[in-house]
Amino acid sequence: MIDFHCSKRHKDMTPIVKDTDIQEYAETLLRDYKPKLLQEPGKVNPIHFVEAYLDAVVDYQDIYYPDDEPAIAGATLFNDDHILVFDREAKRIKPIEVAANTVLIDNSTMADGKEGFATFTVLHEGGHLCLHPAVYRRMGGQLSLFDSHKDGDSVVCCRRSSLEGGGSKRAKLTTQTDFREHQANVFAASIAMPRSTFTPAAQEMIRNCGFRDGVFVMPDVMDWDYSLGVSAIEESLSSLFGVSKAAANVQMKRLGLLMTEEQYLVQHRQFAVAF
C-alpha cells in the first residue's frame, strides 16, 4: 500500500485537497494493486482490495443507531475499541470489542439487490483508512473518546445518507466531517470507476445517444426522453463497474460528462474566453 500525503491540513488534521488529488492517489493505488483496472472497464473486488491490499479486516454487524438518527451503512475503527451493535438473538443492544483497522459493514447494506451500494460502502470505508488516519487514530496513552462522539474519535460511523447512492442529494460541505465524507466518496468512486476506463466507456454510450462531444446535456426543463436516456446509460455503467446507478450518475457529473444546459453553456463560454 502507498501512503497518502498532503501538504495542507485543517487543525483537526483533515486533509485540504482537491478532488483531483484524491483521484490521482486512488489511481496510484490501483496501478500498484491491479493495473488492469486502469486499462479496461471492470469490477473491482472491494473486499479483496480492503483486506488484501489495505491490510484491514472487513466484518459485518447490525450496527446500533438511535431510532431518531439516520441509518449507519458502515464504520471504520482505527484503534482497538468498542462499538454498539444489536444482538438479534438476544434482542438487545450490546457493546462488542473490535480490533484496530477493521471495517464494519452494517448487515442491511449487504441486502440482496444492493450489491452496488455495498461495493461503494466498503470502498468508502477504505477511503477513510487511507485518507484520515491522522484524524482518527489515537497514539498510545490517549483516552478513548468513543462515547463522546466528538471529531477526533478513533471510530468513524458513516450514515447511509452521506454516501453516494445513499438516497440523499449532495449536501453543502460545511463541517470537517462533511469534507471527510466527501473525500471518502471521491476515493470510493475513483477506485470503482477510475477516470481512464470510466470516461471512454461513458462517452461511447453518450455519443450513441447523439451527443457528439461525449457530454450528455440535460435540458433545464424536465424532459422524459432525456431522463430515460440518462437512466439507460447509468444502468449500463452500473452493470459494467459494479456500482449503483446513483454512484454512476454522480461520477458522470463529477467528470463533466453529465451537465445541465446552463452548465454546458457556461463551460463553453469559459473555453471561448480562454482561447
Regions found by a protein language model. Name each.
Residues 1-275:
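Active-site hotspot residues in diverse enzymes, especially metal/ion-binding acidic/histidine motifs
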